[in-house]
């Protein structure tokens, strides 16, 4: 301890710790007091910042000096350990005492001469005295540390590629390497063999240090092995690492600068001794993120929680699944068989939401790539294919066919040329010509404009937007349209026209400020929370509104205005056929597509879906003829139940 701090520094440190100088050298007590004083002097706790800085500097200096002195003592061959002190009074003790004091006498030797008494005359200095250089007061240069000293400061760099670099990990392993002093390595080699019943253990020297390598029959955390070794290395340095490549590490430690000292199996380890199950236990299946992404892509799911719920349903056994047993959905049966094993692993995963979010990102990325590489006509044809597949699952028998054809009859009662209107709208959104991209559905309340707009939105795919919100919130509302095929600005409010009972709103004013969005001539910036801005042509679509005034600057952006008028018989027939509203038949894209199949020739459809269109035309002819459909139209006109059959 006398070689650590100066006398004044030691006194100052003990005063700051609140200890008497008699406690100097009691490191555990000083450590306890140091932690206590840190809380007392800390500035955040109302302490003295200057005292805190001084205490830290002195205590850290003490720790460094103690470590340095310990290392120097280990390097000195002539230092006696306490167990080697001979018995007092024997010749061996006398020799030991003389050797012990010779070191201190050399250290305490002083070359200065005592001043002479005043009566003595000074002697004449010789030439040799004059030429003797004066003693320098500068600090002597520190001895350059060799590799043996440096080896104890860090883990060998030669082995870093074979070990785990994780600092805080709960991972369990069967291979470990311990780096410490040579003396402690001998002790730990025996203790570790006994404690962990090691399958293999070896000890290797590395300059003035040593390493112990062990293979255990059971898996352990690195912290468990490290804590066990700490019990034998209270002062000596210690590095404990988990090993990722056991044979690679052992092979490297048999070559320079390492030296094999001993091992419990003669001949050591061979490369063919190792298999994955030998080192890491039985192989465990891991969750396949790619399979989950493929599942989301096939179903077109872009909702995290919907994907999470659907995939969890696949974790049950196929034999116990009600959907599979009912054979209602062939696609579900196939997906359940393909993904049941992976879904079971997914149910045990602790990062379910993160995995689902990545799968959703894959779906969005695929959709964005398709929007760049495919024409709008091909995108719409693919959308129709999905709706036709959905029709195969939903419309299964005569009752379902009649229900959806009742919806077709209602639409033809709304507008006798509704099929021509829909066909022209589809042509407009596919061509997407600037300033000819938006239609306006205008009419009083309960005139059917929102029903038609919702069905067209479901047919083509897209999102409905609320434009009546304050202008400062529009950016995130418009961001919903990113990568969408169409949009609907629903129930836009504006300045009151002839109907004074309507409430006014700022929807028209907001649309007037979005002329670039409606024109489609230039790309606009769309943004969502937690996502970067996306530049794209804003999607075409529909604007629904009551009898509001359209600003003169906004009217040229609308390609066509479709006027709707309330019809009493439509409302009455709908009230008497509640199934259409309960099952949302009129708002479904399937109903509009069935209407096109019923009314339009096959040649009007894209070639890739014409075969399915022919199939559905034949199916409709099988379940409903022209006479029965005419009866449905008559029921709509009379305000009766559309599904009511007439007596012959």
Swiss-Prot record:
Q: Which residue intervals define the domain J in the entry?
A: 12-89
- Modifications after synthesis and translation: Phosphorylated on both serine and threonine residues. Small t antigen inhibits the dephosphorylation by the AC form of PP2A.
- DNA-binding region(s) from the entry: 156-271
PROSITE patterns documented for this protein: DNAJ_2, SF3_HELICASE_1, T_AG_OBD, ZF_LTAG_D1
Q: What is its main location?
A: host cell
The cellular location(s) given in this protein's UniProt record come to: Host nucleus
Q: Where are the transmembrane segments?
A: none
Disordered, as annotated region: 111-150
Binding-site residues, ATP = 443-450
The record's cofactor note says:
DNA helicase activity requires Mg(2+).
SUPFAM superfamilies annotated for this entry?
Chaperone J-domain, Origin of replication-binding domain, RBD-like, P-loop containing nucleoside triphosphate hydrolases
Q: Which cofactor does it need?
A: Mg(2+)
- Annotated SF3 helicase domain ranges read 417-579
Name-wise, this protein is Large T antigen
Organism encoding this protein? WU polyomavirus
